[in-house]
């Protein structure tokens, strides 16, 4: 709950939580608000864009000729395309979580690196969304319990009247 002291409203308990992210034995801090229900809206806006970038990666090799050797120009163009897609993906993920997720969770390499056939960005999103799912569920249960305690005397009375 917010507290008021000397005309100052303290909403610090609504701030982000600190999570430690381990990458190759190193711990980095990531700040998230895992009870932010508006993430659902952001997911609905960002997922189509991520899928579009996934489609772009399928056509990334279109720049390559059918020759056995790759030219320097092809390497430069391929690198440019990969870099653009990676930057777009990082921006979308940071926007999704309203935090510097890409910097903390993927400080090097590409978001399209794979682990057991799964893109790095998918692993990051799935892992962090699990925090949100769990926390939003807990907060919803607390809210329902609180509402029930405040309305129980009215609903119990209404129930008695309707059963007569």
Regions picked out by a protein language model, each given a short descriptive name:
Residues 2-74:
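Short N-terminal mixed-charge amphipathic segments
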Residues 4, 16, 28, 42, ...:
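Arginine residue identity/basic-tract feature
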Residues 10, 36, 54, 62, ...:
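Acidic-enriched, low-complexity/disordered segments with a strong bias for Aspartate over Glutamate
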Residues 33, 76, 80, 115:
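Charge-dense, low-complexity intrinsically disordered segments
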Residues 39-42, 46, 85, 89, ...:
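Alpha-helical structural motif
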Residues 69-88:
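Intrinsically disordered, low-complexity acidic Ser/Thr-rich regulatory segments
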Residues 90-164:
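C-terminal charged interaction modules
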């Amino acid at each position: 709950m917010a507290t008021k002291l000397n005309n100052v409203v303290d909403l610090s308990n609504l701030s982000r939580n600190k999570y430690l992210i381990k990458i190759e034995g190193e711990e980095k801090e990531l700040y998230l608000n895992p009870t932010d229900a508006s993430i659902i809206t952001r997911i609905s806006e960002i997922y189509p864009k991520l899928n579009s970038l996934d489609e772009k990666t399928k056509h990334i090799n279109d720049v390559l000729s059918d020759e056995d050797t790759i030219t320097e120009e092809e390497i430069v163009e391929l690198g440019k395309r990969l870099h653009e897609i990676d930057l777009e993906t990082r921006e979308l993920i940071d926007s999704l979580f309203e935090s510097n997720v890409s910097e903390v969770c993927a400080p090097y390499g590409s978001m399209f690196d794979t682990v057991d056939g799964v893109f790095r960005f998918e692993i990051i999103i799935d892992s962090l969304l699990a925090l949100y799912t769990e926390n939003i569920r807990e907060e919803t249960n607390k809210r329902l319990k609180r509402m029930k305690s405040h309305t129980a005397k009215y609903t119990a009375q209404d129930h008695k009247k309707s059963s007569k």
